[in-house]
Design a protein with these regions (language model features):
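Hydrophobic alpha-helical segments
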Residues: 1-204
């Protein structure tokens, strides 16, 4: 997994403002399933891995499995390999990964053209929304990780304490309900979930 990048308050605020203006689309994509849920989770997991977010990668592995993503597809997503996917699915994954690697800048022209071959303008807008939302969550969780690193005496280069405290506090509040949801929805016993999270923490 590549190195994770923390967020700054101004950058995250700008991302949040874009998402706030698109709340009706959020309701359609997540609430009403306008974008195929399996494809949505494949894209979100690919973006989480591109952004090196261990927390989001862990959580979205569980959601992806629930939506029918196979273990082989999970492995291919994390290795950025195309052979496990049809051309349409891979066009979305590769495009989203490129956007994540470019800090939400444009993807290379060939990826933009390939995406347009398989998705209409409305679908491309939905994929953009998913990529933006996942990136905002990823960099927030990475900033929480930067705070944990600072507390262990290993501050992350170019990461500011004020960003870590403000953003990390929000992430810390979100972790317990997400963990509870995973325990109930995925029927993961608390002891197993705690062991997996400890392993995740030790990997940092």
């Amino acid at each position: 997994m590549p190195a994770s990048e923390p967020a700054t308050l101004p950058v995250l605020a700008a991302q949040a403002a874009v998402l706030a203006r698109r709340l009706p689309e959020v309701a359609e994509v997540w609430g009403r399933g306008r974008l195929d849920p399996k494809l949505r989770e494949q894209v979100m997991l690919a973006v989480a891995h591109a952004n090196a977010c261990r927390w989001c990668t862990y959580a979205h592995r569980q959601w992806a499995l629930a939506e029918g993503v196979t273990d082989a597809e999970l492995a291919a997503l994390e290795d950025e390999r195309s052979e496990a996917f049809d051309r349409r699915t891979w066009a979305a994954i590769a495009w989203a990964q490129a956007r994540a690697h470019a800090d939400l800048g444009p993807a290379p022209d060939e990826l933009e053209r390939e995406l347009a071959r398989h998705f209409d303008a409305s679908e491309r807008a939905d994929l953009d929304l998913v990529t933006r939302a996942m990136t905002a969550a990823n960099v927030s969780a990475n900033t929480f990780d930067a705070l944990l690193s600072r507390l262990r005496g290993r501050p992350v280069a170019h990461s500011r304490l004020v960003d870590e405290v403000a953003i990390g506090a929000g992430v810390a509040l979100a972790i317990p309900p997400v963990a509870a949801y995973l325990m109930l929805w995925r029927r993961r016993p608390p002891r197993l979930l705690a062991r997996e999270l400890r392993t995740l923490h030790a990997a940092r």
